[in-house]
């Protein structure tokens, strides 16, 4: 069995997990998430309140789906209890971010400000003019929104200017040699 897939998924108090055919719905204090399970995989609820992900055979694809499904359901439970956050930093002279209602307005060296609207289930928090946080209950959506914002002005390798994840190391290059 998959080493990750065979681990039981603990369901904390205050979280309600419903298994309806191939659909798993997780309700918690922060919201509701739904996931459709791939064909050969099954999810069972045990008497002790944990979830068990099972697979029928040891085919390569099935083994991969086994661990993936277990991790996705565990992330759904974490999302509806604690939520997920991704912190981004802005480096560069004149580069900054400010909140405009629920939107973010970036000054990134373009001739115009760039406005980013949060999709449903995502919220933004501006900590300083050069640091902000993307919050949400869906880990995939939080990461996707953060990656799209980073794409607006990727960190460039010569001066390191741009939008980066907190703690990200930007590989620097040496500039051209002068005379």
Swiss-Prot record:
**Domain of life of the organism encoding this protein:** Bacteria
- Xref: InterPro entries: Ribosomal_uL6-like, Ribosomal_uL6-like_a/b-dom_sf, Ribosomal_uL6_a/b-dom, Ribosomal_uL6_bac-type, Ribosomal_uL6_CS
Entry keyword annotation includes Translocase = no
Query: Its Gene Ontology biological processes?
Result: cytoplasmic translation
- Tell me yes or no: is Ribonucleoprotein among this UniProt entry's keywords: yes
Instruction: Fetch the Pfam families from UniProt.
Output: Ribosomal_L6 (PF00347)
Record keywords, A-Z = Ribonucleoprotein, Ribosomal protein, RNA-binding, rRNA-binding
- Molecular function GO terms recorded: rRNA binding; structural constituent of ribosome
- Which Gene Ontology cellular-component terms appear in the entry? cytosolic large ribosomal subunit
- Biological role stated in the UniProt entry: This protein binds to the 23S rRNA, and is important in its secondary structure. It is located near the subunit interface in the base of the L7/L12 stalk, and near the tRNA binding site of the peptidyltransferase center.
Q: What protein family is recorded?
A: Belongs to the universal ribosomal protein uL6 family.
Q: Which PANTHER family does UniProt cross-reference here?
A: 60S/50S RIBOSOMAL PROTEIN L6/L9, LARGE RIBOSOMAL SUBUNIT PROTEIN UL6M
Instruction: Tell me how this protein assembles.
Output: Part of the 50S ribosomal subunit.
Q: What is this protein called?
A: Large ribosomal subunit protein uL6
Q: What is the lineage of its organism?
A: Bacteria, Bacillati, Actinomycetota, Actinomycetes, Acidothermales
Q: Which gene encodes it?
A: rplF
